[in-house]
């Protein structure tokens, strides 16, 4: 599959399966991938990043989001959810790896300005269910908590564990 085309294929499945008049479809992105680097500016669901993406993953998620918007324009009852950095049981994210490295003393430094809005996996699942039950087709919903820098996250981890927080470097 060409990058980003999974969205087109997934949205066509319901039509091909003969599902008539579904109340809503659900499409998930992440806040990081869709919004890319906002240069520290807090944004809401209406924000659309138009600059150069910070990674290929980021770019292809934006392509998929554009495809989802085309389905919305064709009046497919699509609801978009955008979780923040998901954490919790079963976590395989970079954040988890960084925390484990920190606990083992193998995380020497952090970018000083990198921020993230975290979302616990149970809250994320609940947000998906609410979007399916009550979400307005054509709308997007961010599922995330307050923004934190990675420095904030690891200062808290340092306070909890008693381990020295990693050094920070400009980002």
What are these regions (language model features)?
Residues 1-57:
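Conserved Rossmann-fold NAD(P)-dependent oxidoreductase catalytic core, especially the SDR/UDP-sugar
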Residues 29, 66-89:
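Conserved beta-loop-beta element that borders a ligand/cofactor-binding pocket
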Residues 33-34, 86-88, 124, 148:
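Conserved sequence/active-site signature of Rossmann-fold short-chain dehydrogenase/reductase
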Residues 48-52, 100-119, 123, 135:
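A conserved pocket-lining segment of Rossmann-fold NAD(P)-dependent short-chain dehydrogenase/reductase
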Residues 60:
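Active-site helix of classical SDR
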Residues 63, 94-95, 111-132, 139:
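Substrate-positioning beta->alpha
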Residues 127-171:
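Mid/C-terminal beta-alpha module of Rossmann-like enzyme folds, strongest
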């Amino acid at each position: 599959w060409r990058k980003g085309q999974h969205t087109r294929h997934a949205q066509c499945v319901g039509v091909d399966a003969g599902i008539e008049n579904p109340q809503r479809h659900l499409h998930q992105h992440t806040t990081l991938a869709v919004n890319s680097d906002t240069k520290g500016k807090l944004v809401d669901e209406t924000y659309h990043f138009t600059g150069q993406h910070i990674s290929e993953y980021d770019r292809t998620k934006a392509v998929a989001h554009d495809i989802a918007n085309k389905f919305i324009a064709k009046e497919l009852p699509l609801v978009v959810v955008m979780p923040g950095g998901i954490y919790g049981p079963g976590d395989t994210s970079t954040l988890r790896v960084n925390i484990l490295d920190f606990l083992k003393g193998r995380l020497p430094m952090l970018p000083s300005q990198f921020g993230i809005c975290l979302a616990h996996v149970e809250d994320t699942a609940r947000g998906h269910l609410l979007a399916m039950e009550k979400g307005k087709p054509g709308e997007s919903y961010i599922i995330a908590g307050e923004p934190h820098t990675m420095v904030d996250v690891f200062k808290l981890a340092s306070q909890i564990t008693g381990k020295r927080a990693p050094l920070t470097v400009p980002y």
